[in-house]
Amino acid sequence: MNIKATCIDYTKASVEEREAFSLVPSKIQELEQSILQTYQLDGCIILSTCNRTELWISAPKAVLSSLSPTAILCDALQVPVEQYLSFFIPYLRYGNSFRFRIHPQNRLR
């Protein structure tokens, strides 16, 4: 399975910066369907809690390699990616290997 993901959370962004990405369940469902159709993905999951928002997408490697989950999420929410890019943490998985950005104190970031 090929997966890319992105996360904006309290460790990199203030409450004010995260507000643009705060989502209620009905909006999450709407965005997931829109993203799936727009980008012809195999899968799409959005997780939104009080201190983080994540977008996980799945597609064939050839499709996924040209996609940025951060840009997709910003586009779907109509917020400028350039303004928020530095607050996001990317994740990547091709096949059986998963790569996270690891914080020096051994915490996932």
Question: Can you name each region flagged by the protein language model?
Answer:
Residues M1-R109:
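N-terminal ligand-binding/catalytic initiation module
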